[in-house]
Amino acid sequence: MLIPRPYQQDAYDAALKHIRTSKDPSIVHASTAAGKSIIVAMLAQTVKQANKRTLILVPNGDLAAQNADKFREIGEKPSIYSASLGHKCVENHAVFATPMSVLNNLDDFGEEYALIIADECQMISENLESSSQKLLTHFRSINKNIRILGLTATPVRFKTKLVSAGSTFKSVCYSITSEQLASQGWTVPYSIGVSDSTYSL
């Protein structure tokens, strides 16, 4: 049985509350090593229990497989849709996919999805003609009430904020930084250089 860390539970709770109360896309900012795949799995499981579908978008096939494995760990069956992995399945309630594989095969995604989770959401372009915006437009045309949740360890895009009035994402519903992870004992604090006691010439 997978037991989430306290901050993972907090992130899940905050994201679920936002999804249930607002149509505005929001972000979970979770630093590297926070275990975002667990948060994703918990959210997708909750949506499945409501007999609805989740599309989880990740940058590459390896991450699709890793996130799908985490979903299996909590006793659920994922689908994977990634050309690089040779898998194009949408039969289960949670589909882990790469954006271009979806965009190139939109006819396979005609069913209504309740939630899109976009990992590494800082990569989503604000250009309305971009592939990412075309993808979001497709799913919004099927379900005008679809919820969109972004996950990122980097809440900026090319030195600009991800969250603003004119951007895709309107808020950050939860945040945990690398400093907070270290102070809570989940990670080792970053250090630069090598101590004199371990370095000699």
Language-model features: where?
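Post-DEXD/H (motif II) to motif III coupling segment of the RecA-like Helicase ATP-binding lobe
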Residues: 123-190
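Conserved RecA-like ASCE ATPase "motif II neighborhood" in helicase/translocase motors
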Residues: 94-120, 124-135
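Hydrophobic residues on the short alpha-helix immediately C-terminal to a glycine-rich phosphate/catalytic loop
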Residues: 15, 39-47, 135, 139
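Loop/turn-to-beta-strand initiation segments
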Residues: 52-53, 91-94, 113-115, 144-149
